Amino acid sequence: MLDIKWIRENPETLDKALAKRGAAPLSSELIALDEKRREHVGKVQAAQERRNAASKEIGKAMAAKDMGTAEKLKAEVGELKDFLAHAEEDERRLSKELSDALSTIPNIPLDDVPLGKDESDNVELRRIGNPHNFSFQPKEHFELGEALGYMDFERAAKLAGARFTVLKGPLARLERALGQFMLDLHTTEHGYTEVMPPLMVRDEAVYGTGQLPKFSEDLFRTTDGRWLIPTAEVPLTNLVAEEIVDMKGLPLRFTALTPCFRSEAGSAGRDTRGMLRQHQFLKVEMVSITDAESSVAEHERMTACAEEVLKRLGLPFRTVVLCTGDMGFGAQRTYDIEVWLPGQNTYREISSCSTCGDFQGRRMNARYRPEGEKSTRFVHTLNGSGVAVGRALIAVMENYQQEDGSIHIPEALQPYIGGLTRIEKAA
C-alpha cells in the first residue's frame, strides 16, 4: 500500500508511475477523498475538545452554584455527544473508503525498471549455460512421463479434474528430491531459516501481501473463510505482521517447501497439457525482511540464490528484468529466471524474485526501529521462488532425457534419491 502523505506530496510522480503500468491517473481522486476525510477528522477533534472543555466547565459552574450555566453546558455536551456519534461513524466510513482505494493501487516501479507493455518488452540480463544439442528430437515432459509410466494425467483428472497430476515411483521420488535439495542449499549455504507454515491463512494475511482485495478470483477459499496459500510468500512474509522487528536481527531470511494452490483464472487454453500450469504444485519460497537501506542489495542476493539452484542442477537458464507492464501488483522490481525446455524449444519461467519496498510492510503494519531513532519505519520485504519444484522436475526431465526415453539424474540430486542415476520405463 502506498502512503497517502507521499501521494499528497508527489501526485505527478504517482500518475506517471501508474501510466508506466498502463493504469489511469488517480492522484486527484485520492487527494480529494483524503481532504474530505481530514476535514471531517478536524471537525471531530474540535467537537471532542469542546466536549471535554465543557465537561470541566460544568464542574466549575456546579462548584460556584451557577446552576443556569451548568444546565446550559450540560445541554451543549449532550448535543456534542449526539453530533460525535454520527461524525465518528462518518469518519470511520471515509477512512475505510480511502484505505480501500489505496489497497487497489499497485506499487511504484523503481527508476531502473524498463518501460514496456507486456512480456515482449522484458529485458534479458544474462544467460547461463548452453542448451544441449540433441542427436534426436527432444520430447516434452508429459510425453516422457507418460511413456515411462510414472506420470498419470488421466487418473488425476478422474480424482480432481483438469490441471492436476499424479506422479508415481521414481518421478515422485525425483520431485521430492528436488525440494529437499533446494531446502538444504538455501538453509546450509544461503543463510535462510526453514519454516513449516500453515497452508491456510486468514483474510489479513492475504491482504498483507497484496493478493486481496484485487485478486481474490485467483485464490481458493475454504467454507469457513480461510484461504489456501497461492505461495508460501503469504505466510512467510506475514510472520512479522503487526510487529516491531528488532533492527539488529535484520535481515530475516525464511524459506519453505509447500504445496501452493491457484485457480489459474484467466489461463484458459494456456499450457493445458502437462505440469506447467497446475491448480496444485510444490514450490520452495524465499522471503527476506530488511531495513530500507538493504533491500536493493538483498534483491540481487536473493536472485543469485535462486540462480544457484539451476547452476547446481546443470540447467541452462536466462535472467530477465520485467518491464513496468509485466510486473506483479506489489513489486517495485522483478527478476524472472527462465529455464530452457528443449521439448518446447524455449525458455520458461521457473523463478520470480521481487523487491516490494515498504509496500507490504505498510499493509501488514510491520515495522522496525532504526538504531538511534525514536520513530519506527515500515520494513522492506522481498520474495522469490527458490525454485518452483514442479517446473524444475519438468526441466530435469527434458534436459536430461536420453534417446531411449530414460532420464539421467543430475549428480547433485543422486544423494537425495538413493544413489539412483537413471529413471527408466516401468517394467
Curated annotation (Swiss-Prot):
PROSITE patterns: AA_TRNA_LIGASE_II (PS50862). InterPro entries: aa-tRNA-synt_IIb, aa-tRNA-synth_II, aa-tRNA-synth_II/BPL/LPL, Ser-tRNA-ligase_type_1, Ser-tRNA-synth_1_N, SerRS_1_N_sf, SerRS_core, tRNA-bd_arm. One of its GO terms (molecular function) is serine-tRNA ligase activity. GO terms for cellular component: cytoplasm. Pathway: Aminoacyl-tRNA biosynthesis; selenocysteinyl-tRNA(Sec) biosynthesis; L-seryl-tRNA(Sec) from L-serine and tRNA(Sec): step 1/1. The keyword Disulfide bond does not apply. L-serine binds at residues 231-233, 285, 385. ATP binds at residues 262-264, 349-352. It is an enzyme of class 6 (ligase). The keyword Cytoplasm applies. Its EC number is 6.1.1.11. It catalyses: tRNA(Ser) + L-serine + ATP = L-seryl-tRNA(Ser) + AMP + diphosphate + H(+); tRNA(Sec) + L-serine + ATP = L-seryl-tRNA(Sec) + AMP + diphosphate + H(+). GO terms for biological process: selenocysteine biosynthetic process; seryl-tRNA aminoacylation. Keywords: Aminoacyl-tRNA synthetase, ATP-binding, Cytoplasm, Ligase, Nucleotide-binding, Protein biosynthesis. It is found in: Cytoplasm. Catalyzes the attachment of serine to tRNA(Ser). Is also able to aminoacylate tRNA(Sec) with serine, to form the misacylated tRNA L-seryl-tRNA(Sec), which will be further converted into selenocysteinyl-tRNA(Sec). Consists of two distinct domains, a catalytic core and a N-terminal extension that is involved in tRNA binding. Belongs to the class-II aminoacyl-tRNA synthetase family. Type-1 seryl-tRNA synthetase subfamily. Homodimer. The tRNA molecule binds across the dimer. This is Serine--tRNA ligase. The lineage of its organism: Bacteria, Pseudomonadati, Pseudomonadota, Alphaproteobacteria, Hyphomicrobiales. The gene is serS.
